[in-house]
Amino acid sequence: MKVLLLLVCLVFAYVNASYDACYNVVCPSNYQCRAEGDQAYCVPEHHEYGCDRHSCGRGYECVERWDSFCCKPIHHRPHPHPRPPHPHPRPTNCDYTSCPREFDCHVINRNVTACLPDNHVCRDFQCPVGTHCFNGERGPHCVSDTHYPNLCRVTKCSYDFTCKMVRGNPTCLRNHDGISTHSPTHTPTHSPTTSPTHCPSCTELAPFCHSAGLVCRTILNPSCVSAVRGIINTRSCCTYIAVCASNSTSTTGATTGATTPTSTTGAATTAAATTTTATSTTGAATTAPATTTTTSTTGAATTAPATTTTSTTGAATTAPATTTTTATTIVGVTTANSVGGLTTTRATTVAGVTTANSVGGLTTAGITTVAGATTGNSVGGLTTARATTVADVTTANSVGGLTTAGVTTVAGATTGNSVGGLTTARATTVADVTTANSVGGLTTSRATTIAGATTANSIGGLTN
């Protein structure tokens, strides 16, 4: 029995010692109890050490106090209260908003609280533009915006909010003027959709647009969203903005129009120079002051309407000569005013030019072969029809002699009063062009290639 009692005392003492060796231990002033294992010691207080330099025994932990630190059993450590998994929600605008039946409150942002349908009937019901779905007693159907029921009458918004119908849903919008209203029919002084105080207009932007060659237009600002879930502070958004845009109907360049009179041969004439040809006939034709043709700075030939004055004495009178210009490009052409005719110098290319300036013969415009033509002012009455050989041609008292363009052989020709007869000098290729610059004959100088041009300036009636 004594042994059993002793064992119980030892166990009790051991339990108490393991529980806290410093339990009921009182140390002198400036000393503190330290438990190491199952022993308690009184040690001087050293506050500067703290728990970082003091280690407690097994099953104990150091606890700092205002003026000291001590070792406490670990099982005496109070367990912290666990935080709730979800904090209590703060009151929102929906706590102060009353929506119509079958509508639920949704906080879009701090400025917008919308009442949206609590079912998906109208959400999946498609309505055309200008109408909205309304789920009434007859079920979902589309109602025009003008006849859509104003659900704001049965909607109550929280303080400082005003109800507006947005896409068929009552929506509470914050009043920016600070005026509180609970009346569904109240209209705030400043509507949230009102444009801000200053928005750029075309009055300010037009000078900058015009300087860049653009025009100013006023368009709807795509940044202002009107959807319920996209509504932001619309007061800070300009509903209409001014932009610089290109004018699709305007022209970027000026149009230059030229007046082109038409001669008797049907070819176009462009004015830039003056040609005067005076012709008199006394038994034969005489070609007076030569033709003058100037070249424009762009390299294209410019030929003026020719004025021909014709007088006859005992001979036929030809119609006023025609100067026709259909030339696309005439480069480097210089025509001097010689005594006997036309002088062409360094004519490189003359394309598509038809010049008819005959006194008494056939005027051919752009035709290489003349068939069955009768020359009306010919001395010998020559009719040329695709002729390669010209015979029995008499030129009497001619200054310019016989003008032959593209003729291979001239047979039996008599020049009665010609100074130099017919002269062709270094004509490499002369295609349907005759240039006379001689007192008594024909002179073609350094004409390399003249293509597609027909010049008729004959006295004796030959026109090629």
UniProtKB/Swiss-Prot annotation:
Residues 250-320 are annotated as: Disordered. The N-terminal part (18-235) contains the information required for insertion into the coat. Forms a triad with cellulose and pspB that is essential for spore outer layer formation. One of its GO terms (cellular component) is spore wall. It comes from Dictyostelium discoideum. Glycans are attached at N111, N247. GO terms for molecular function: structural constituent of cell wall. PANTHER family: LP04239P, MUCIN-19-LIKE-RELATED. It is found in: Spore wall. Residues 21-43, 121-143, 151-173 form the Follistatin-like domain. The keyword Repeat applies. The gene is cotE. Residues 1-17 form the signal peptide. Keywords: Glycoprotein, Repeat, Signal, Sporulation. This is Spore coat protein SP65. One of its GO terms (biological process) is spore wall assembly. Binds to the C-terminal region of pspB.
